[in-house]
């Protein structure tokens, strides 16, 4: 069975979206692309699939929120941008998913969530 056939038969599909998919070269969110992505995910969910969206983009959305043009090199500054951008990104996802009758939720994971059995089990149950 090739990859396309496995995908057609999959009960659960994980979609990983990178920053360049969500943000235009200008640094502004690409609302049209986000809407198409969410519509496809909602259609698959309505067809009975379990859907998980893994999304990057919080730093870029945070940069746009405060008008910053260049990504800082310092980790604390990136963390601050991610904190700003994450809530904005989730607000966008919640709005787009609501347009298609779906509820968006957020689960924040770290490497430790996969490495430690009890954390892995809790994360899996949350999903």
Predicted regions and their residues:
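Nucleotide/pyrophosphate-binding catalytic subdomain
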Residues: 1-127
């Amino acid at each position: 069975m090739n990859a396309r056939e496995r995908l057609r038969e999959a009960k659960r599909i994980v979609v990983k979206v990178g920053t360049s998919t969500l943000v235009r070269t200008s640094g502004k969110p690409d609302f049209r692309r986000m809407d198409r992505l969410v519509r496809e995910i909602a259609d698959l969910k309505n067809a009975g699939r379990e859907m998980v969206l893994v999304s990057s983009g919080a730093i870029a959305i945070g940069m746009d929120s405060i008008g910053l043009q260049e990504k800082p090199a310092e980790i604390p500054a990136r963390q601050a941008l991610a904190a700003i951008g994450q809530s904005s990104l989730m607000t966008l996802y919640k709005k787009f998913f609501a347009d298609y009758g779906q509820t968006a939720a957020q689960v924040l994971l770290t490497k430790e969530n996969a490495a430690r059995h009890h954390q892995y089990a809790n994360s899996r149950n949350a999903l």
